[in-house]
Amino acid sequence: MGREQRQFIQMIAALTMLIDHIGMVFFPSAIGFRAIGRLSFPLFAFGIAEGVRYTHRFWRYFGRILLTAVLSQPIYMLLFGITQGNPLFMLAWGAAALYFFRQGKRAVAAVLLIGSYFADMSYGWYGVWTIFCFGLYVERESLCFYGQLLLNILYGLKTRAWIQLLSLFSFGFLD
């Protein structure tokens, strides 16, 4: 995947997230905004997985995500009235799990993957596992898609947020 395609994916992710958040704040009963917004997270997760894959200084990359998470947490809490960790904490967690897996430290990765179920952060285990799936994307595209399908079904069973299944359409941007 070339640089221009990665930038296009980042732009689509940001735009669909903006639409989702506009809907959440200003039009909470308009489901269309939320439906469009379902495309954003998998694209961000893909970007994190690609970042882990290509960065030469993982801990600097990880630190930037974590610092942004800490600095944006008060705004997130104020704007959305939510006390759980914002999605950037989950992105950092997922990046760490994937990094340790790629470094051959499978036990550490497993602890992070399992531990994500108990963490109080936006997208939680679903988000961490989504990043992990996308980390395997390069070599196993169909496995990633079916892994995402399974994650979405499990997420739907746990949260009743079946709208998240629409996130599978994000794969259309990754070809």
Task: Go through the PLM ranges and name each one.
Residues M1-D175:
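Alpha-helical transmembrane segments and their immediate juxtamembrane cytosolic regions
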